[in-house]
Amino acid sequence: MENMHLRRVRTMPRHSQSLTMAPYSSVSLVEQLEDRILCHEKTTAALVEHAFRIKDDIVNSLQKMQNKGGGDRLARLFLEEHIRNITAIVKQLNRDIEVLQEQIRARDNISYGTNSALKTLEMRQLSGLGDLRGRVARCDASIARLSAEHKTTYEGLQHLNKEQQAAKLILETKIKDAEGQISQLLNRVDLSISEQSTKLKMSHRDSNHQLQLLDTKFKGTVEELSNQILSARSWLQQEQERIEKELLQKIDQLSLIVKENSGASERDMEKKLSQMSARLDKIEEGQKKTFDGQRTRQEEEKMHGRITKLELQMNQNIKEMKAEVNAGFTAVYESIGSLRQVLEAKMKLDRDQLQKQIQLMQKPETPM
């Protein structure tokens, strides 16, 4: 019965398993009652056997006493004891019967509760079975629908497979055509590469020839520039020496004139100084013009040197040479400027000395 109950509990849904705890307790009580009944039956059987043994002993003793004689008193005592034992056994049996009746009533009540619980469980199981049957029916319907969909999808897959095979054939033909076109293009590319390689070789030869020409031209320009720089330096040195000589001569002449003609005025000296400064300005303008001419010539050569990409290195060298030339000209200008400052300072000192001498020469004339 317990195994059947467990099977029912396993087949029940989850929401009804909480109600199966009461039948478990009732089953345990029934088992306890059955165990107690078995114990009482064993005790009663033992008591009955003990009573029958006493009875047999009494009968045997009475028979012995009758055979011997004078055993009425002992027989009576044995009978009284036997009656007491029987009455005690009967009382014990009555009490046990009452207890068993109460336990049977409780068992009947428990069995009634278990039966009602089992009926409710059976009803719930029937309802669960109905739900399961409905679910099974729905599952059968969904399976039928899925089988129909599977059939349609299988047919669609077959159709797609056929289309794929047709498309594969078309693609293979197109791939073959493309491979033929690619081979033609590769042949054309090879031809163009060979033509370009020949052109590059020719252009390389031309560029080497042009580089040689540019190298010779650059060497010529460098030599010309170096010659011009040397000539300019020599000319500047000559001019500087000539100007220094002229200035010294004029200073000497002025000192002689001052010594000879003490009555000369300062206006003549200023005119002469202004003429000398104008002459110096003319000399500087001439030098600037020569420098500007050389600069324009270098720029023209630089513009002609930027014709091709291969002339970049040559242009860099030209720039370096130009920087050197500019540095040389700037040094020349600085030397000319410093010389001019020295000459102006010297002229100023000479003029101050002349003015002092004139003042000294004019002072003795005033008291006379």
Swiss-Prot record:
GO cellular component, one term: postsynaptic density, intracellular component
Keyword Cytoplasm found: yes
Coiled coil: 78-110, 161-192, 236-290
Keywords: Coiled coil, Cytoplasm, Synapse
Subcellular location(s) of the protein: Postsynaptic density; Cytoplasm
Superkingdom as given in the UniProt entry: Eukaryota
One GO MF term attached to the UniProt entry: molecular condensate scaffold activity
PANTHER family: PROTEIN FAM81A
Protein function: Facilitates the interaction and assembly of proteins within the postsynaptic density by promoting the condensation of postsynaptic proteins via liquid-liquid phase separation. Required for neuronal activity. Accumulation at the postsynaptic density results in enlargement of dendritic spines.
Self-association and partners: Interacts with DLG4/PSD-95, GRIN2B/GLUN2B and SYNGAP1; the interactions facilitate condensate formation.
Homology family: Belongs to the FAM81 family.
Protein known as: Protein FAM81A
Organism: Homo sapiens
Lineage, broadest ranks: Eukaryota, Metazoa, Chordata, Craniata, Vertebrata
Gene that produces this protein: FAM81A
